[in-house]
Design a protein with these regions (language model features):
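Conserved GNAT acetyl-CoA-binding A-motif
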Residues: 61-74
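Conserved beta-strand-loop-alpha-helix junction that forms the acyl-donor binding cleft
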Residues: 71-81, 99-103
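Conserved acetyl-CoA-binding loop of GNAT-fold acetyltransferases
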Residues: 86-96
């Protein structure tokens, strides 16, 4: 599988409401696992944008030949995202104690989430 970094933009009514990247989580022996990062515009929260981007990223990862997808750092206090990723088939496979410096809460845990494609 050739290494590549893909980026996508979600639009609604001509307005950018989100974006995500997709690439191999690692080179070499781990290159069959995809990694994504998503951003949803604050004004678009609750409109299904993140769910649509996740669904698109899973389909795109499969089309590129990835066999799994991993999120390396999901902030433990982002309960909405955790529920969504779990609903989309991801499982929490690890906890990183104090791995995220939250601007309001200080150091909080982060999760590694994973699913086989």
């Amino acid at each position: 599988m050739a290494p590549a970094n893909d980026a996508f933009v979600a639009e609604a009514a001509g307005e950018v409401v989100g974006s995500y990247f997709l690439h191999a989580n690692q080179l070499g022996g781990g290159s069959h696992v995809a990694n994504c990062g998503y951003v949803t515009a604050q004004q678009a929260t609750g409109r299904g944008i993140a769910r649509a981007m996740c669904r698109h990223s899973i389909d795109h990862a499969r089309a590129r030949g990835f066999r799994a997808m991993q999120y390396n750092i999901v902030v433990s206090t982002n309960e909405r995202a955790i529920r969504l990723w779990q609903a989309m088939g991801f499982a929490i496979v690890g906890r990183l104690p104090g791995a995220f410096a939250h601007p309001a809460l200080g150091d909080v845990d982060a999760f590694v989430m994973y699913q086989t494609l």
